[in-house]
Swiss-Prot record:
Domain of life of the organism encoding this protein: Bacteria
Similarity comment: family membership: Belongs to the UPF0229 family.
Taxon lineage: Bacteria, Pseudomonadati, Pseudomonadota, Alphaproteobacteria, Hyphomicrobiales
Listed name of the protein: UPF0229 protein bll6755
Chain positions covered by the region annotation Disordered: 86-107
Originating species: Bradyrhizobium diazoefficiens (strain JCM 10833 / BCRC 13528 / IAM 13628 / NBRC 14792 / USDA 110)
Length: 427
């Protein structure tokens, strides 16, 4: 017999959820492009709120069948501008509201409001952590055990006493099994009875209750329940992202704003995209400290600059909490490129000997003043050091930003989906 399931859940906001999802699937590339364009002009907080995007109306046409009388290739008579073989281009200069006759076709647009979740999903759709594969384990999942309700058979060690007693009580009530106090009252009445005829009736009633008690046991084998467990796949590949940020005195408010925006976007990306990624926030001046999210983004700090302090702090945390044989380790660093001259050698040693050998990927973001005039001069000492390491084959990517509008494209470039090492090795 067929089973019919009717979903009577209300659509959100009185809208057709099925039509909305169908539209997003069909126009995904157009909507995604509009999201990327809109996000470049937004604040991170605005990105999380969703909003209105605009896509070309021409991209909304659905395929349909129509009659066609054959293919014709001709130029109608009466024009002095075109000949056979010319391409006709859309003018695009008019508007739907004010263009008059003969002023060209308008570029109509379709405005669509995205929810918070839809906006973030589309923006992060083609981003991922590079090479997310545990290097010493080929498989990506292992078997784990978790509770999965109850069963009528199992090991005595797994008996659920509470569930068994609950089911037994429900069965006794349903079958009206005589209670102990009822039997005791009847026995007391028999002992106190002096009338022989009445005593016979009471004895017959007692015998009836005792027989029913035997037929309906206190706990029946059908009542017994065992805790049930089942094996479920558990991810083996674990990832941890270290966020390193320079908050020293050489970092202007504009630079700190750029760095914070980059890390806020990274934080949203990781929390939204992956369930099994841990994030460690480390900020540094001439000394480094691990802080929480609120302090990392909004806590005031200033001082000198020693990049090695942040790298040393990261190394210590990796050694204590994140075994490289079990964890995929990623790091993203934001700085203005300034570093103490005496700290350069130690920074290089920490990177080459301690940090990069255990990292799957290391991203360096160098922030500058608005206009990027400083980037036109010679490279910073930190940029020169990192560039040398990158050219030697280290898993390191580098970018420079000086404007808010550059944060999103740079972030997308750093974390766009790439071929994994297994895919590259495959024939």
């Amino acid at each position: 017999m067929p089973i019919h399931i009717i979903d009577r859940r209300l659509n959100p906001g009185g809208k057709s959820l099925e039509n909305r999802q169908r539209f997003l699937r069909r126009a995904k590339s157009l909507v995604q492009g509009a999201v990327k364009k809109t996000s470049q002009e937004r604040d991170i907080k605005d990105v999380l709120e969703g909003g209105e995007v605009t896509i070309p109306l021409d991209g909304m046409h659905e395929p349909r069948f129509r009659r066609e009388g054959g293919t014709r290739d001709m130029v109608l008579p009466g024009n002095k501008k075109f000949v056979e073989g010319d391409y006709l281009q859309r003018s695009g200069q008019g508007s739907a509201k004010d263009s008059g006759p003969g002023e060209g076709d308008s570029e109509d647009a379709f405005r669509f409001v995205l929810s918070r979740d839809e906006f973030v999903d589309l923006f992060l759709d083609d981003l991922e952590l590079p090479d997310l594969a545990k290097r010493k384990i080929a498989q990506t999942e292992s078997e784990g055990i978790q509770r999965a309700g109850y069963t009528t058979s199992g090991s005595p060690a797994n008996i659920s006493v509470s569930r068994t007693v609950k089911l037994a009580l429900a069965r006794r009530i349903a079958l009206k099994r005589p209670r102990k106090d009822e039997i005791e009252e009847l026995e007391a009445a028999i002992a106190a009875c002096t009338d022989e005829d009445e005593r016979v009736v009471l004895l017959a009633e007692l015998e009836k209750l005792m027989a029913k008690t035997k037929r309906i046991p206190f706990i029946d084998p059908l009542d017994i329940r065992y805790r049930r467990f089942e094996t479920v796949p558990k991810p083996v590949a674990q990832a941890v992202m270290f966020c390193l940020m320079d908050v020293s005195g050489s970092m202007s408010e504009h630079m700190k704003d750029l760095a914070k925006r980059f890390y806020m976007l990274l934080y949203v990306f990781l929390k939204r995209r992956y369930k099994h990624v841990e994030i460690v926030f480390i900020r540094h001046t001439d000394r480094a400290e691990e802080v929480d999210e609120q302090t990392f983004f909004y806590g005031p700090a200033s001082g000198g600059t020693l990049v090695s302090s942040a790298l040393q702090a990261m190394h210590d945390i990796v050694r204590e909490r994140f075994n490289p044989s079990d964890w995929n380790i990623y790091a993203a660093q934001a700085s203005d490129g300034d570093n103490s001259y005496s700290d350069g050698e130690l920074t290089g040693l920490l990177l080459t000997d301690k940090i990069l050998p255990v990292c799957q990927f290391f991203a360096y973001l160098e922030v500058g003043e608005s206009g990027g005039s400083a980037f036109d001069l010679s490279d910073s000492s930190l940029w020169t050091l990192y560039e040398r390491l990158r050219n030697s084959g280290a898993p390191l990517s580098m970018r420079k930003v000086s404007e808010r509008s550059e944060i999103f494209p740079v972030f997308h470039d750093l974390f766009q989906r790439r071929e994994t090492s297994q895919e590259k090795a495959a024939p």
